Amino acid sequence: MRFSGMDMKGINMLFAAIPSICASSPKKISIYNEEMIVARCFIGFLILSWKSLGKTFKETLDGRIESIQESLQQFFNPNEVILEESNEQQRLLNLWISLRICSTVKVVESLPAARCAPKCEKTVQALLCRNLNVKSATLLNATSSRRIRLQDDIVTGFHFSVSERLVSGSTTLVEASTVEQIREAFLLEPRDLIREGFIVLRKVRVGGIPGTCGDGVGL
């Protein structure tokens, strides 16, 4: 049975008035009603405690009921509980990995090597450029030496060819002038060099060099 606010107030006033009435009664009534006084005082204490501590008890009971319900839910639905725990562990793992990556990046950025990286890069670039220049110079020297060797081989070949074409009775002046003309031709560019060489060789073959006859015999 529920009581309204006014009824509860009246009941409290009644319980508060009973001890005073019993205390003001004659001695026999007071002794006779000692058990009733104790019972009524205990009831009044319970009412006052319920008013002051009822909210705390209610919150405690609600929390206990909620925990019991969660335990029952975990007991009847273990898969959902395991899935939630797995998601929570995965979230914590991702958070831990992110924090570790951030700390690693911070440590790497704070290292002296990271500050010296631009200088090292410039040093590497300088070494590469120097090696490239050395290789280019070596290639140019090799090309020049091969060109000189080729010129010497061509001069030697023309010299032997002219010597075979000229007869033994030709003058030394004609042979010397022919070889000198060939050597002067090799001072030109490679294209002009080949052209002049063929001209000299043609003159030697047809006997067009001054001081020689058509059959290659000196005049």
From Swiss-Prot:
Annotated transmembrane regions: 29-49
InterPro entries the UniProt entry points to: ATP_synth_Bsub_B/MI25, MI25_plants
Hydrolase is among the record's keywords: no
Predominant place of localization: mitochondrion
GO biological process: proton motive force-driven ATP synthesis
Membrane topology: Single-pass membrane protein
Keywords: ATP synthesis, CF(0), Hydrogen ion transport, Ion transport, Membrane, Mitochondrion, Transmembrane, Transmembrane helix, Transport
Signal peptide: none
Record localization: Mitochondrion membrane
Entry's Gene Ontology cellular component terms: mitochondrial membrane; proton-transporting ATP synthase complex
Any one GO MF annotation of this record: proton transmembrane transporter activity
Subunit organization: F-type ATPases have 2 components, CF(1) - the catalytic core - and CF(0) - the membrane proton channel. CF(1) has five subunits: alpha(3), beta(3), gamma(1), delta(1), epsilon(1). CF(0) has three main subunits: a, b and c.
Similarity comment: family membership: Belongs to the ATPase protein MI25 family.
Purpose: This is one of the chains of the nonenzymatic component (CF(0) subunit) of the mitochondrial ATPase complex.
Protein name per its UniProtKB record: ATP synthase protein MI25
Native source organism of the sequence: Zea mays (Maize)
